């Protein structure tokens, strides 16, 4: 047996595979190729959290595109629920499998991810793929992107502008690039000039985009679907509300008209969601009536409308998204940990509601905890 190979760690990987002992007798130049292949095969069979822990063994393997793509493809086929808890100024992440066909009174177990430093922002703006976009307001606007699985995080550079407003996180599935759009403004009455940062570039710099739009204020939610950012906005000049669209690939703005004048009345109550790849918007009233709008034709600004009467069990919860099968998911705003924590799946077609118990938060006894629930989280082990 070749002692040099043993010193390089090959025996560490394969001592439990007797049928692979022949490997040690082949030339080193071929051995390296086989080692990479076997490691890729091994990574494809273990959870993403375990892959993240393996980085101390072989960082170069983790950075290979075929390894990260294989892990991401596997994770996308099995989306997860992500839970973010604010406990004593700490932001903690947990995750569980996302049930495809939940049944009433079933249960899930949420397991923790890595902890992040206390000084990171705790305001969650967006989760996209396997990354989470955090933002801190007050005087110093700090923007951080973190990976709950690997524990990596980066702080984005400061934006240089007269005025700095909201920032939005997006992903272009064609170029496979993550980008951040920062809304900045100049003096009143002049078109806004906004800035974009591309996450994948080696030197992260903000650059001004060449598609200014008139001053407006974001009036409610935001979401990124298939590389396009959507958010509701009020325009002072025209005294109207519209859906603002930003294509992250071409870095261009466009607009979608609302369905009727009353659609976004009381717009602070509206939330946007992904409905089977289409833009959806909903308004939830206290009497249990849920109004759903779905953008059927973006080019012609055509919306469909439906109304649901929800059961009382979800009246104190908020909508956190819609599953790929069309079920609306509700989650409480917060929880007091001695009490059980439930999420609810409402089937629009059958008008049935399924309650699922989420376990795993028992360590936070006697804590009143703000809790955010996100659907379709993808475990991504890629380095940032």
Curated annotation (Swiss-Prot):
Its domain of life reads Eukaryota
Where is the F-box domain positioned along the sequence? Answer: 28-74
- InterPro entries annotated for this entry? F-box-assoc_dom_typ3, F-box-assoc_interact_dom
Return the protein name: Putative F-box protein At1g53360
Origin species, per record, is Arabidopsis thaliana
């Amino acid at each position: 047996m070749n002692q040099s190979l043993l010193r390089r760690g090959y025996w560490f990987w394969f001592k439990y595979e007797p049928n692979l002992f022949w490997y040690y007798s082949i030339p080193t130049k071929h051995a390296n190729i086989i080692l990479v292949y076997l490691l890729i095969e091994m990574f494809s069979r273990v959870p993403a959290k375990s892959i993240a822990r393996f980085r101390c063994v072989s960082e170069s393997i983790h950075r290979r595109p075929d390894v990260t793509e294989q892990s991401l493809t596997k994770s996308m086929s099995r989306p997860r629920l992500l839970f973010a808890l604010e406990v004593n100024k700490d932001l903690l992440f947990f995750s569980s499998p996302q049930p495809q066909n939940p049944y009433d009174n079933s249960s899930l177990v949420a397991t923790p991810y890595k902890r992040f430093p206390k000084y990171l922002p705790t305001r969650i703006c967006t989760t996209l793929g396997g990354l989470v976009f955090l933002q801190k307001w007050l005087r110093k606007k700090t923007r951080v992107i973190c990976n709950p699985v690997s524990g990596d995080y980066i702080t984005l550079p400061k934006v240089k502008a007269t005025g700095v407003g909201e920032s939005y996180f997006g992903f272009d599935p064609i170029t496979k690039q993550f980008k951040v759009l920062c809304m900045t403004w100049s003096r009143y009455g002049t078109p806004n000039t906004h800035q974009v940062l591309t996450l994948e570039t080696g030197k992260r710099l903000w650059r001004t985009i060449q598609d200014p739009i008139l001053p407006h204020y974001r009036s409610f939610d935001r979401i990124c679907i298939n590389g396009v950012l959507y958010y509701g906005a009020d325009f002072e000049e025209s005294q109207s509300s519209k859906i603002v669209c930003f294509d992250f690939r071409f870095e261009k703005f466009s607009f979608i008209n609302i369905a009727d004048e009353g659609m976004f009345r009381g717009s602070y109550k509206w939330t946007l969601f992904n409905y089977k790849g289409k833009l959806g918007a909903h308004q939830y009233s206290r009497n249990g009536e849920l109004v759903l709008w779905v953008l059927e034709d973006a080019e012609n600004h055509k919306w469909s409308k439906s109304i649901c009467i929800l059961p009382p069990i979800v009246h104190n919860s908020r909508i956190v998204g819609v599953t790929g099968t069309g079920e609306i998911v509700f989650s409480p705003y917060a929880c007091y940990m001695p009490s059980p924590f439930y999420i609810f799946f409402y089937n629009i077609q059958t008008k049935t509601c399924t309650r699922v118990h989420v376990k795993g938060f028992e360590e936070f006894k006697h804590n009143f905890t703000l809790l955010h629930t996100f659907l379709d989280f993808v475990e991504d082990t890629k380095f940032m």
